[in-house]
Amino acid sequence: RKNSFVFANELDPFAAEAFKANFPDIRMINEDIKQLDKDTIEQMIGEEPVDLIIGGTPCQSFSTVGQRVFDEKATLYEEYLRILSIAKPKIFLFENVKGMLSMRETFYKKDKDGNIVYEVKKNKETGSERKYPVVEGYGRKIIDIIKEKFAFITDDLGYNISCEVLNTVDYGVPENRERVFVVGIRKDLDMEWKYPTAIKADKLSVKDAISDLPVVLENQNITNYTSQPQNEYQRLMRGHNNVITEHYCGVYGGKIR
């Protein structure tokens, strides 16, 4: 089963469909990961040992963009830990946004029955109201908790952990997108991990990436290239296909015009 993928999991149906379109040979389980029990996972894995698990939890709860709110998705890394404890892979890769490095565990006020106390706050711009949990204080950094739990998952399963912030623009992507990568190597293996070296040459710009796209006007949909690729990146992205998808312009209202 060298270089074969056992299964992938995704809750969002649209993301799952996109994954299946791009990776039709990989089994996609489109459901809540919490519903995947130990027996089901072991049955899908089979008898052979697992080499690698790649994943990450929803990034909204860790994002530095916008206002973070109380969100149980922030604790979904515990499901990742559960999968690791079942599959016991040689290596795992956990990825998330840079904001995860600054997020701390949050302690919420509770009533005498142990229920979280909420307060209603009004949005100054829209006037809409929303309930927020009342915060009593903050504790350790989430990243420290995650690294600690990954290092000692069970009494007989642990990983040597390394953590690094990488920027996609340093690896040939025309975008500044920083992400945290946590790599774990099982402690019983004599292996060392090194993160890839950043590209020293000129960074790929958006112009480098999409300057071969034809101009699209309002209420227009273009499905074919009208020019030759202008650099190696554009040739790579096209492959042997001259068809363009999702290259259209909608009809705008008066304010946008």
Per-region residue spans from a language model:
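S-adenosyl-L-methionine-dependent DNA methyltransferase catalytic core
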Residues: 1-5, 145-156, 160-163, 170, ...
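Core alpha/beta nucleotide-donor-binding catalytic domains of modification enzymes
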Residues: 1-112, 117-120, 124
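Residue-level signal for pocket-adjacent positions within structured domains
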Residues: 23, 28-31, 57, 95, ...
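Residue-level detector of flexible, active-site-proximal loop/helix-junction positions
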Residues: 33-37, 168-170, 217
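Conserved Class I SAM-dependent methyltransferase catalytic core
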Residues: 74-185
